[in-house]
Amino acid sequence: MSKNLLIELGLEELPAYVVTPSEKQLGERLATFLTENRLSFEDIQTFSTPRRLAVRVSGLAAQQTDLTEDFKGPAKKIALDADGNFSKAAQGFVRGKGLTTDAIEFREVKGEEYVYVTKHEAGKPAKEVLLGVTEVLSAMTFPVSMHWANNSFEYIRPVHTLTVLLDDEALDLDFLDIHSGRVSRGHRFLGKETTITSADSYEDDLRSQFVIADAKERQEMIVEQIKTLEVEQGVQVDIDEDLLNEVLNLVEFPTAFMGSFEAKYLDVPEEVLVTSMKNHQRYFVVRDQEGRLMPNFVSVRNGNDQAIENVIKGNEKVLVARLEDGEFFWREDQKLQIADLVAKLTNVTFHEKIGSLAEHMDRTRVIAASLAKEANLSAEEEAAVDRAAQIYKFDLLTGMVGEFDELQGIMGEKYALLSGEDAAVATAIREHYLPDAAGGALPETKVGAVLALADKLDTLLSFFSVGLIPSGSNDPYALRRATQGIVRILDHFGWRIPMDKLVDSLYDLSFDSLTYTNKADVMNFIRARVDKMMGKAAPKDIREAILASSTFVVPEMLAVAEALVKASHTENYKPAVESLSRAFNLAEKADASVHVDPSLFENEQENTLFAAIQGLTLAGSAAQQLEQVFVLSPVINDFFDNTMVMAEDQALKNNRLAILSDLVSKAKTIAAFNQLNTK
C-alpha cells in the first residue's frame, strides 16, 4: 500500500533570489534519491516560503522493488581446476558478490562458457530507506552559505526545524544539529509553532498559522489582490514578473495594499520614480487608464490586514525619503556642466590594471570613428558618434546615478538634452549600454549602435590585454555579455563588417594608455559567442562548418546557419554536401602557387566545371548563394567520374587540384562543407 511522504526544512530567512531555485533543487534531488533507491512514486509537489523548503511525495511505494542482477565471472576454463573443482578465481568471484559457489551456473557467450551468478536482493521497507534522505539535504548547493553558532558545517541559513512524515508517522532523523519531529513554525509574527498532523494536512496546518506554503498559491493571491485594487481604484498596476517573483519569496502570508505620495514628485523623471519604487522598495507602479504614472504604489505586506493603515503610512514614509533624494539630485544635477564632469573622469578608475574611465573613452572614440565609416554612416551621424564618444560616461559623476546606479545612461540622455546636446548624441549615451542583459533590447539608432559596439570592443580588448579573461563560468566583468551584445548588434543592423579584419585593425591602433594584446584569444572568444548565437537552431556540424569558413561577417554567418538548417531537410542536401566535401578534401593537396591552365584540360568535364566556377558569383541571400553552390553538384560529380584528379602526370594533377581549389575558395566563403555531417 502506497504512502505519502513530507519533508520540510525550517530555516532562518532566505534571500528571495534563492528560494525558488532551492525549492526546485530539493524536488529534483529527492526524485533522484527515490529512483536510485528503487522507491517508486506517483507525484512530487514542492513548497517554499522565505523560511522553509518542503516537498511532498504522493503514492510512495511501501518498500523498494526487489532487485535481481546477473553477474558475469571468469571463463569456465579458469573457473574449474584440473579436477573439476571451483578454482580460487571462481571462489573469489562469488565471495565478492556475497554468494557461494552453489550459485554458479555456466552460460555460453560467443562460443565460450563463462561463470554467471544471479543475485536476488529483497526490497527494504520505505521507512528504512528514507533514513537516508538527509543525504539529499546535505547535497543541496547554494550560491552563498554560512556558519552559525559553534558548528563546523555551513548551510544557506541556520536550520531550526526538520519535519519528516510518512503519512502521519514522524521518522527519526538527524540533520546538522537538528533532530526531526513534526513541529513546524508558523508566521513569524502572526503564527506560532504548530504540529504537522500528517503529510496530507501540511498546507492546512500551516495556513492556520498564517503561512501559505505553496508559492504558486501565494502568487495567485498577490495577483488577485492587485487586480481587486485596480478595479476599486480605477487604475492600472504594472505587475512586473521579476518583481512579482521576488515579492512572493519575501512573504508567507501576502496582503496587497495601495499607498500614495505627493503629486509634486511626478515632476521628477518617471525612470527615477519607477526605480525608487520597484528596485529599491519592491513596490508595484500604478498608472491611470491612459498609462500615465500616478502618485500611488502597490506593496505587499507579509501578514494580514490588521492595522493596515499604519503599514501604509510606514511604507509611504520610507518611499517619500527616496523620492526626496531623487528630487534633490534631479534639481542639483542640472546645475552641473558636462565638460566639468568629463574632465573629472580622468580621476575615475575603469580598472586598476587598465586605467581611467577617460582613457577608456578616448580609445572608444577612436574605435567608434572607424566603425562609423565601416557602417557607412552619414557625415551628420559620424559627427554625432564623435560627440557622444567624447562625453558618454559623464553621468556616472552625477548625484542621481551615484544614488541610483541603475539609471546610468538613462540620466545621461536626459541631462544631455537639458544641456543642449543633439538628440542623436543624447540617445546614443543611453543606448551604448544596450543590450544590458541576455536577450535584452538593442540600440535603435545607428549612432547608438556604433557607440555601443566601440565601447564593448574596447572593454573586451582591454580586459583580455591585461589577462583578465573569463574562465569556466567565472566572468566577473561580464565580457561574455558584452561580446554577445557585439554579435547581436552587428546582426540586427546587418552590418557586413568582417570581424577578423576589424579586430586586426584595432590591434594596429596605438594608444599611450594601453597596448592591445592576446588577439588570438579575443578572436576565439568572439567565435564562441557567434557559435552560441547559432546554437539556438543549428546543430554542431553546421556551426563548425560556418566557423571554419573563410569569412567572419556575423550577419552572413547567422543567415547561412539558418539556410543550411533548412537545406538539411531537403533531398538534394546529402549528395550536394558529399560532392563538395570530396572537392574540399582533395583541394587541401593543391599547390597554392599553381593557377588553372585551360590548355591542360583533357576532357569536357574539366572545361565545364572550370567555366561553372568562373561564373559563380554567389550573389543574393544566404539561401540563394547556397543554392548556387549546390546546383554545381552534378557538374562536380561528372568531373570526378571522368577525371583522374591525382594523375601520374604532375602538371595534370596540379592543374586539376587547382580547379578544385578555385571551387573551394569560393564555396568556403559560405561554409567549410567538408565539416558537414550527412549520415
From Swiss-Prot:
Enzyme class label: ligase
One Pfam family this sequence matches: tRNA_synt_2f
Reactions catalysed according to its record: tRNA(Gly) + glycine + ATP = glycyl-tRNA(Gly) + AMP + diphosphate
PROSITE patterns: AA_TRNA_LIGASE_II_GLYAB (PS50861)
Keyword Aminoacyl-tRNA synthetase: yes
Keywords, alphabetical: Aminoacyl-tRNA synthetase, ATP-binding, Cytoplasm, Ligase, Nucleotide-binding, Protein biosynthesis
One cellular component term from this protein's GO annotations in UniProt: cytosol
Main localization of the protein described in the UniProt heading: cytoplasm
Subunit-structure text: Tetramer of two alpha and two beta subunits.
UniProt-recorded name of the protein: Glycine--tRNA ligase beta subunit
